[in-house]
Structure formats: structure tokens, C-alpha cells
Swiss-Prot record:
Residues 626-661 form the UVR domain. The beta-hairpin motif is involved in DNA binding. It is found in: Cytoplasm. A motif (Beta-hairpin) lies at residues 91-114. The gene is uvrB. Residues 429-595 form the Helicase C-terminal domain. GO terms for molecular function: ATP binding; ATP hydrolysis activity; DNA binding; excinuclease ABC activity; helicase activity. Residues 25-178 form the Helicase ATP-binding domain. This is UvrABC system protein B.
Length: 665
């Protein structure tokens, strides 16, 4: 019996019991890698939850974006209501990295907006890893970035125990040392206040308040209290207060780091001057000396992460400490949608280094800034003790490394079989598809259509609209949250047909979609490769009448393999249903906007409308300016995501001017 306890209204069915048993046996035999090859809608998350329960190891579930991470976290919290299921993603609402564009001689400072709630969830994850074994952390790829040294984070924490005498002044100094600030008026996360014999602390990792009551110098009581009503929620005998930031540097380490930074600066200046890069040398000298002064005086400076190698005492090239280092030695990794996530792990390091190289070469940063980086792929896998890859279409690397430990999960608990596939010629494909669409609309079903080009998607959308079809076009400029809104509207029946160039979004749960149409299916490329075709066809695999139509004049190798694999699965599923007398049942799952509630949604004007509104800002009433600022911030975030730094800087400057106007400057 492990510490994990599943609460589920249903037992494993279909292929799930076999998959659970085989995965569990493989892990217990101490095999390092195994793959769950699970068709869409077969309940892979349920299977993984059962395996976690049986194995009982702290588990990291890695998803390739924060939206899917939130979905997985919600599902696992439902399965494990009495265990710690944590959520760990990047805490930036907006992040524009420091950058330099040599062509235009443009330097762009790092600007960021931290989401306090997500920061709290990150701290909650590391606290749980220190205090419990029954922990599941669902994370995005941000977990491979530096997070501070676990041992220093733990050693810096402040223990409290009822009945123990403490020096109250020293206790307050200790809280300040671990980045808590005193605020007797506004108590929040990362703050504390003192009223007589009562000390109240807002921990960085939860929204409850810790109240410590003293009798003289002795701790008389420790309680969790409601931050609004002050009502006691729980009484405790002891408690540990963890730092308000993950990066904690002891004073003696800070002094050594400053000396090391100064030594590196001296060597780098000599190097730049020898290359006759006098401007770069002057720039680096001025910036670094200012940072050193800030570090010595207040222990912090803007861009402090660029000195992380010195602050952590690492050797050049040594990998940073990450979330993985907060796990115990014996832990389990689950890589969701591994065919997307594994390549993402490989790609993070190279993209980070190319930007930093420019900053270093032009005197904005010391060479050691390159060691403030994500893990390299090989460094990441060296830290992994055991792993399950999960995908309907695992990549070749995952299949090779799993050897013969590839466990299939083909049968759906609902009895629904894989879609029936039809291949039709491209001649007259639009009118043929229109007829199919109208049939589905009459049955109140939904349709996904994928094209190869943006132009064709736009033309097809316009053609269908002219013929009375309620259709939407999903394009690349739509952000992740608005994308979820559109998909929810499709499920609710606000419109019936969704058209896009790349509707390949793994993990989409669209049980109302009964038809997937793939235009130009015989044009080989990423969007028409075998795995992409299987994933796209799988969007109709949750409907009892699911079908896929591939419009093509030739049968490509990718098409043949995708059709063969789908028909193989369909045959297995049909035979299972016949043997067990199962009638496929439709999935009844109400549309949920839980993710939208978690991640703030803001309606956005397009860029041209925003430019016009900004130009007319002098004529706007003051009460309308905050809304314009909100819209500009949204565009700034989008530009930064696309690495359009100059565009993002333009929006940043406009926001500053509007805020000055609000303040009457």
C-alpha cells in the first residue's frame, strides 16, 4: 500500500487493466524507459494515475504547454483528492527577455510581469516535495530552467515549534533574510507583521496566514488562520517557513560570488580591449560594476540570474539546479504527448544560447551569463531514473529507447471505435465536403477541416459562410487562451465547422466532432506526415459515428501507414466489442471553461485598431485609458512570445506614456 489513494467513480476497463499491470511490472523490474502507446480517448490519464498509485513514487508529469498541464493537473486532482497534486509552470504573465539587435543597434531591457498565483503554486510544489512522498507535480517545459539550490532553500527555512523559546528579534531578522518583508498594514504573500505578542506571516506557498502567538519568548501557539475573517483553520505543533524566493544565497556565498564576478570582469575587459572592442569594454565595465555594488549593498540586482553560476558556486558549463533536483533520488517521470515534448526538451538550450551569445559579444553580459540556461537534453535525461512516455504516436527515439516495453492501449471504455476512413479525389472536393458538412449539421454534430495553406483556409471559410454554414477559421495569430474559447464554442454549438491550417493540437477533447476532413492529404510534409495524420484523424475518435475523409489523388506512404494503423486499431476495437457484447456509447462530457477561469482571458483589439486608439488617446476620457492599457499589454505579450522585441518595446513605451497621463505627469 502506497501513500497515493485514487478516488474514482469507475474501475479500469478495456485495455486499461492490462496496460496498468504491464507498466507496473516494468517499473518494478527497474526498467528505465517504457512507452504507453494509447489511442485517443482510451483513458491514458486514468491508466497513469493507477500506475502512480501502485508504484508510490513522487512523480513529475511533463506536458508540452501550460494549457495541457492545467488540464492534466485538474484531472489528477480529481483522481487524488487526498494527495499533493501540484502545478508548476512559468510564472510570467508577460516575459520579454533581454536582447540586443546589432543591425539596428537596439538594446531591449528585460521586462516581465509575474503572476502571483502561479508563483504561489510553484512554491507549493517545492514545499510538498520537501515534506511529503505522495506528490505529483504537473509541469511545463519551464521545469528544466534554473530554480536555486534545494539544500540552501531548505537550510534557509525557519523552523517554528510550540513550547520552544526564541529570540523574537532574531526571528524577524531570519524572516527578512529569506526575503520576507515587514508590512504591518497589508499582509500578503511574502510578508509578515507584528502586533504585540502575535506574529503573522503570509507564506509564499499558500493563501492561508500563519499566526504565531508568544508568551514572553516562548511560542505559545501556531495556527493557520483565514486571511479575511481571521478564523482559526488549523492548530499546529510545529511548522517550517520556507523562503519567499527559490534563489537564496547565504551572505558568505554572496561575498565569494562578488569576488568571482569582479575577477571574471577583469579578465573579460582585458580580452575585449585586446580585440580593440573599446565600446563593448566600457559598456560591460559600467554595467557590471553597478550590479556588483547593488549585490554588495542589498543582495540583489536587476538581471541577477545572469550571475547565477557565481552565486551558486558552479563550475563553468556545469548544469543548473532545477525542479528535478528537488525530487528525491527515486522518482518517476511521465512525459505526456512525448512525440512533441521530447523534441521540445532538445530545442530549449539552443534557442536560449543564440540570444545570450549576442549579448555577451557586444558587452552587455559577462561570458558566465551563458550558464544561466535550461538543461541540455543529455543533462536532463541523466537525471531521470525511470520514465513512462505517453502518446498515441510516440516518436522513434522513445520507441527505440523503450525496446520491447511498448504497452498498447487501444480499447476505449465507451466502446467507441477509431474513425472510418475514406479517400476521395480532389476534383470537386469543396462541394463534396459541403454536402458532408450539411449532413453533420442536421444531426447536430461538429466538423473539423484542415487545409495546407492559410489562403485556402480563408477562402474555404468565406465559401461556407456564403452558403449559410456557421463556420470559424482558426489561425496562428490566435493566442492559446482565445483558442480554447473557440474550441469551447465549437463544443457548445455556437458554430458547427472549424477550419484551420494546423488543427493538430494533441490532447484536444472534442467528443461532438464526428467528421474530420483533410484536404490535400497527399502533399507530403510535416502536416501530412504519418504521425500528424493519425493525430488529426484521432480528433473524430471520440464520436460513435466518427469518420475521416482524406481528399487526395495519390496514396502517399504516410497516408498508407496512417490508414493501416487506424484500420488495425479499429479491427481490434470492433472484435473486442463483439466478443463482450459492447454497444459503443457516446461520450457525455459538458463543455468546461475551467482552464479559462484559471488563465485570465482578455478580449483584444487588433493591432491596427490599437494604433488608432493610441493616436487618439488625448481625446479619450481618463476612465477609458485603463482599458486601452490592458489591450496594449496583451499585444505586448503576444509580440514578445513571437520574439518581435522591437514591436513589444513599442507597446511598452506606449503603456508607460498612458500611465503617466493617468497620473497627470
Amino acid at each position: 500500500m502506497t501513500g497515493f489513494q485514487i478516488k474514482a467513480p469507475f474501475e479500469p476497463t478495456g485495455d486499461q487493466p492490462r496496460a496498468i499491470a504491464q507498466l507496473t511490472a516494468s517499473l518494478q523490474a527497474e526498467h528505465r524507459f517504457q512507452t504507453l502507446l494509447g489511442a485517443t480517448g482510451t483513458g491514458k490519464t486514468h491508466t497513469i494515475a493507477r500506475v502512480i498509485e501502485k508504484i508510490g513514487k513522487p512523480t513529475l508529469v511533463l506536458a508540452h504547454n501550460k494549457t495541457l498541464a492545467a488540464q492534466l493537473c485538474n484531472e489528477l486532482r480529481e483522481f487524488f483528492p487526498n494527495n499533493a497534486v501540484e502545478y508548476f509552470i512559468s510564472y510570467y504573465d508577460y516575459y520579454q527577455p533581454e536582447a540586443y539587435i546589432p543591425v539596428t543597434d537596439t538594446y531591449i531591457e528585460k521586462t516581465a510581469a509575474i503572476n502571483e498565483e502561479i508563483d504561489m503554486l510553484r512554491h507549493s510544489a517545492t514545499r510538498s516535495l520537501f515534506e511529503r512522498k505522495d506528490v505529483i507535480v504537473v509541469a511545463s517545459i519551464s521545469c528544466i530552467y534554473g530554480l536555486g539550490i534545494p539544500s540552501e532553500y531548505l537550510n534557509a527555512s525557519v523552523p517554528l515549534q510550540v513550547g520552544i523559546e526564541v529570540d523574537q528579534r532574531q526571528l524577524l531578522r531570519d524572516l527578512t533574510t529569506i526575503q520576507y518583508s515587514r508590512n504591518d498594514l497589508d499582509l500578503g504573500r511574502g510578508r509578515f507583521r507584528v502586533k504585540g505578542d502575535v506574529l503573522e506571516i503570509g507564506p509564499a506557498y499558500e493563501d492561508r496566514i500563519v499566526r504565531v502567538e508568544f508568551f514572553g519568548d516562548e511560542i505559545d501557539a501556531i495556527r493557520y488562520v483565514d486571511p479575511v475573517t481571521g478564523t482559526t483553520l488549523q492548530s499546529l505543533d510545529n511548522l517550517r517557513i520556507y523562503p519567499a524566493r527559490h534563489f537564496v544565497t547565504p551572505q558568505e556565498r554572496l561575498e565569494i560570488a562578488c569576488a568571482d564576478i569582479a575577477a571574471e570582469l577583469k579578465d573579460r575587459l582585458t580580452e575585449l580591449e585586446a580585440q580593440n572592442k573599446l565600446l563593448e569594454a566600457q559598456r560591460l565595465d559600467q554595467r557590471t560594476r553597478y550590479d556588483l555594488e547593488m549585490l554588495r549593498e542589498v543582495g540583489y540586482c536587476n538581471g541577477v540570474e545572469n550571475y547565477s553560476r557565481h552565486l551558486a558556486g558552479r563550475s563553468p558549463g556545469e548544469p543548473p539546479e532545477t525542479l528535478i533536483d528537488y525530487f528525491p533520488k527515486d522518482w518517476l517521470l511521465v512525459v505526456d504527448e512525448s512525440h512533441v515534448t521530447v523534441p521540445q526538451i532538445r530545442g530549449m538550450y539552443n534557442g536560449d544560447q543564440s540570444r545570450k551569445r549576442v549579448l555577451i559579444d557586444h558587452g552587455f553580459r559577462l561570458p558566465s551569463a551563458a550558464d544561466n540556461r535550461p538543461l541540455k537534453s543529455e543533462e536532463f535525461w541523466q537525471k531521470v531514473t525511470q520514465c513512462i512516455f505517453v502518446s498515441a504516436t510516440p516518436g522513434d527515439w522513445e520507441l527505440d529507447i523503450s525496446e520491447d516495453r511498448i504497452i498498447e492501449q487501444i480499447i476505449r471504455p465507451t466502446g467507441v471505435v477509431d474513425p472510418e476512413i475514406f479517400v476521395r479525389p480532389t476534383t470537386g472536393q469543396v462541394d463534396d465536403l459541403l454536402g458532408e458538412v450539411r449532413d453533420r449539421i442536421e444531426r447536430r454534430e461538429r466538423v473539423l477541416i484542415t487545409t495546407l495553406t492559410k489562403r485556402m483556409a480563408e477562402d474555404l471559410t468565406e465559401y461556407f459562410q456564403d452558403r449559410g454554414v456557421r463556420v470559424r477559421y482558426l489561425h496562428s495569430e490566435i493566442g492559446a487562451i482565445e483558442r480554447i474559447e473557440i474550441l469551447e464554442d465549437l463544443r457548445k454549438g455556437t458554430f458547427d465547422v472549424l477550419i484551420g491550417v494546423n488543427l493538430l493540437r494533441e490532447g484536444l477533447d472534442l467528443p461532438e466532432v464526428s467528421l474530420v476532413a483533410i484536404l490535400d492529404a497527399d502533399k507530403e510534409g510535416f502536416l501530412r506526415a504519418e504521425r500528424s495524420l493519425i493525430q488529426t484523424i484521432g480528433r473524430a475518435a471520440r464520436h460513435v459515428r466518427g469518420q475521416a475523409i482524406l481528399y487526395a489523388d495519390n496514396l502517399t506512404d504516410s497516408m498508407a501507414k496512417a490508414i493501416s494503423e487506424t484500420e488495425r486499431r479499429r479491427a481490434i476495437q470492433t472484435a473486442y466489442n463483439q466478443k463482450h457484447g459492447i454497444t459503443p456509447q457516446p461520450i457525455v462530457k459538458k463543455a468546461s471553461n475551467a482552464i479559462l477561469a484559471f488563465l485570465e482571458v482578455s478580449r483584444r483589439l487588433n493591432a491596427q485598431e490599437l494604433d488608432t486608439a493610441y493616436e487618439q488617446a488625448d481625446e479619450l476620457p481618463l476612465e477609458d485609458i485603463p482599458e486601452l492599457i490592458t489591450q496594449l499589454e496583451a499585444q505586448m505579450k503576444e509580440a514578445a512570445k513571437k520574439l518581435e522585441f522591437e514591436e513589444a518595446a513599442k507597446y511598452r513605451d506606449r503603456i508607460k506614456q498612458l500611465r503617466d497621463k493617468l497620473l497627470g505627469r
